[in-house]
């Protein structure tokens, strides 16, 4: 009988005959099945009368077989294409619904005939809808992944214990999933995202004749039950970001899924692919889009609800591979949006001038904001700067950018040392070729600058910034271009003080001192030095320079410094006084070494015994650097002039002039 029930088309009369001498509750078979188990396992079990007969014959509807399944559990666990509602009801009624939780809701949902009335019966008699399947999906999660979920059944599930608002079990604060991104940075989203994610993903490539496409009514139903469409999954994707990959995109569904998303053009870099991702970025990228052609109405919708930076990030990576589509998109934008996108592009991206040209063609302009943006771009290059300044006219460099000097952005350290120095410079040699990208860019911009000493909101000049960021080549360029070393910032800081306190760069300090700051500037700088012990060498350089200007400055030097360096000041005084006593050709040794006029004429006295004796004595300890450089150069120049005089042909006009006149003629060359 059991074999018959399990494998044959069961006839009532034949079964009645068998039941006369067989016990339907005989469970001595290997599977411990009773007669109900055997019949309900039969793939042809569609006759409710057979079930009623077995029950009337005393078959126990609560007996559990080797799989610990009652007949109802066996029936709803079997791989039947359909679950017969009448059979299920008979089995439930036979136990007074005590076996209701033996009903396998997950298998039932996969059948082709889910009956809302049967679901209502389960609800009415207390079925536990909080149960989860082997894959840890809830009832509602499984149901939305079926072929054609019905909103009314979704309502029943949710209203009777199926939650669609998740809480992380490990989160002691119980933040709902939808609150993750804005309120709890430590919260990790569930792998599958929301129920809305599951529904969209499972119906992306559905064909209407076998499996339904995404149904707007289902989407509305889920949203109405509190699912936030802006929620993201572990891949940081919203449901909309998946939906735009669908084989059939309904713009009304797109609008539903946009709710709560304040920027449909938001973008991010995918960790695995290093590609720019996001709703708009994915849709424009043919690698993520199902359909070949772009729907411009859909793109316009994204543009209307997207922010310029995200739009820029979405279209720029695709420019080189799909110029036609991107140019078409640019053409559809209004000029205000396009202008914002141009500024974002110039500020944050590696510039392709051909893309800029397209933007300009469709209504954008290179204005002051665009130029200011490019000065902040870490991918700056002189060629693009030339192009942009010529388009704008160059006046933008003369206007502060939120209180900052535009060119000053290039002085900052985030542009990298390589932008200012070549390998030669790193090895100790100055690079003054301006071939370095940032330096050459600044060099190109300077002619547009009406006042190289323009100040920012802190009262600082470009020179202040170049010194602060230790850009020696740039400092040299600015000094050669007329930057004033004497300007004080709003807090009283000079470039000299910055070189000592912040840059701690003696070479920079000497460059500044060589451009002859005023005595007041040097004294003010000394007052600003924060550590008079650790900065001893720098302080001595300043004192040495200041005493050349005025050897009576000891009273002006801050008392803390003058006390600490009193012996050094005395030695400076002694050496300077000695140089002032030595007379060479009507000039003091001091004036020949430390004045501009002296530097121009010192070569005339290259053979002067007193000058040579002073040079060869090397008696100075402090003021040696100047004459140790000047005097050898003076000898070389003198010898060159003398050689030129000797080479003049006899019996010429010049040859007949006195030697002193000939000397003055040739020293001009």
Curated annotation (Swiss-Prot):
The organism of origin for this protein: Cowpox virus (CPV)
A single GO BP: symbiont-mediated perturbation of host ubiquitin-like protein modification
A Pfam cross-reference name: Ank_2
Keywords, alphabetical: ANK repeat, Early protein, Host-virus interaction, Inhibition of host NF-kappa-B by virus, Modulation of host cell cycle by virus, Modulation of host E3 ubiquitin ligases by virus, Modulation of host ubiquitin pathway by virus, Repeat, Ubl conjugation pathway
Family of the protein in this entry: Belongs to the orthopoxvirus OPG023 family.
Gene that this polypeptide is encoded by: PG023
Function comment: Substrate-specific adapter of SKP1-containing E3 ubiquitin-protein ligases which mediate the ubiquitination and subsequent proteasomal degradation of host target proteins. Prevents activation and subsequent nuclear localization of NF-kappa-B in infected cells, by targeting NF-kappa-B RELA subunit to the SCF E3 ligase complex.
Phylogenetic lineage: Viruses, Varidnaviria, Bamfordvirae, Nucleocytoviricota, Pokkesviricetes
This protein's record includes keyword Repeat: yes
SS bond partners: none
Region (PRANC/F-box-like): 586-667
Tagged with keyword Repeat: yes
Chain segments annotated as coiled-coil in the UniProt record: none
Subunit record text: Interacts (via N-terminus) with host RELA. Interacts (via PRANC/F-box-like domain) with the SKP1 component of the host SCF ubiquitin ligase complex.
Protein name: Ankyrin repeat domain-containing protein OPG023
ANK repeat residues: 31-64, 101-131, 135-166, 199-231, 235-266, 277-311, 334-368, 458-487, 491-521
UniProt xrefs under PROSITE patterns: ANK_REP_REGION, ANK_REPEAT
